[in-house]
Amino acid sequence: MPRKRLTGIVVSDKMDKTVVVAVEKLVQHPLYKKYVKRTKKYHAHDERNECKIGDVVEIEETRPLSKTKRWRVVRIIQRFEPERVVKEKEDIQEEIEAVEGKGGVES
């Protein structure tokens, strides 16, 4: 039987050779049938300590490595780039100022 694989974001890298990965999934509410986001955190083994906070990683189920570790990092899908986040915030701010300048927001 193939091992389960999940994709998530690294939320902590403070431990040696271990990262905490937050995995989001959509779950349908049993009564209201609305889809709700659920987040679960997994401790994953990072052999070379290459993962940093904000990285998008793929983790795979493995044998128990410790009391809480049952997953290992397979690969880093995307590195976290703080410059990109700052640039996106600046672009959004410029769009807001442009809309307000045209009279889009009335008080």
Curated annotation (Swiss-Prot):
Transmembrane segments: none
Keywords: Ribonucleoprotein, Ribosomal protein, RNA-binding, rRNA-binding
Keyword Signal: no
CDD domains to which the protein is assigned, alphabetical: Ribosomal_uS17
InterPro entries noted in UniProt: NA-bd_OB-fold (IPR012340), Ribosomal_uS17 (IPR000266), Ribosomal_uS17_bact/chlr (IPR019984), Ribosomal_uS17_CS (IPR019979)
Pfam name, any one: Ribosomal_S17
GO biological process: translation
Matching Gene3D superfamilies: Nucleic acid-binding proteins
SUPFAM superfamilies per record: Nucleic acid-binding proteins
A GO cellular-component term linked to this record: cytosolic small ribosomal subunit
Function recorded in the entry: One of the primary rRNA binding proteins, it binds specifically to the 5'-end of 16S ribosomal RNA.
Subunit description: Part of the 30S ribosomal subunit.
Family according to the record: Belongs to the universal ribosomal protein uS17 family.
Protein name: Small ribosomal subunit protein uS17
Protein source organism: Thermotoga maritima (strain ATCC 43589 / DSM 3109 / JCM 10099 / NBRC 100826 / MSB8)
Lineage: Bacteria, Thermotogati, Thermotogota, Thermotogae, Thermotogales
